């Protein structure tokens, strides 16, 4: 009763009518049910250059204007959708979630590709520091030592690593989507709560700007990871070694030189 009274009083300030459920709707067959409610984020101020109809746009060479369904509501919306991939709202929501998740993985992956090699080049012993060779160490006779230290994690079974990854990532993803004992999730893409111990999302306008920075850096990281994959296939070297080779001899160590000389399988 108190909850219903609070709901009526709070909504009356917004000028909206409230339908108070009857006791039978609340209790059902003698069982109380709880539903996850989703609250809409506070609108970003019109002065932001990244949101709204007057936001920064990149329409590409084949688009005269931004399509009507791209209104600048979401971070990273530059009004460019020549192929119409965002026309269907459900497809757009799914693709947006996939992009944000892949952005986060790519940013972590790019750091994981660069930093071990950077540390190894500065005297830190990692064992195998090149990112696409490190995982294969688990099949060696001595197994895989995390950070080159057998007292941390000494892995010798690929199945055990796979099982740990499934359990740990499954638990985190389940909590991100459905909530858990540490709190209820309002937005699966930006769950906040225990996922935001520093309180970066407390200020709505600062949080909106951080979303834009995340998506921009994430898109750059996805391109970086694609480049790392291509480098690994073509040169068989890590990103920092490729960079050092290019700086030492830019004429013979560049994308054009490798593209014109590369023959798969040789």
From Swiss-Prot:
Cofactor annotation comment: Binds at least 14 chlorophylls (8 Chl-a and 6 Chl-b) and carotenoids such as lutein and neoxanthin.
Sites where the protein binds chlorophyll b 5: 165, 262
Sites bearing Phosphothreonine, chain numbering: 37
Binding site for chlorophyll a 2: 102
Sites where the protein binds chlorophyll b 1: 58
Positions annotated to bind chlorophyll b 4: 165, 176
Localization per record: Plastid, Chloroplast thylakoid membrane
Positions bound to chlorophyll b 3: 157, 173
Binding site for chlorophyll a 6: 246, 255
Entry similarity comment: Belongs to the light-harvesting chlorophyll a/b-binding (LHC) protein family.
Protein name as annotated: Chlorophyll a-b binding protein 25, chloroplastic
Gene designation per UniProt: CAB25
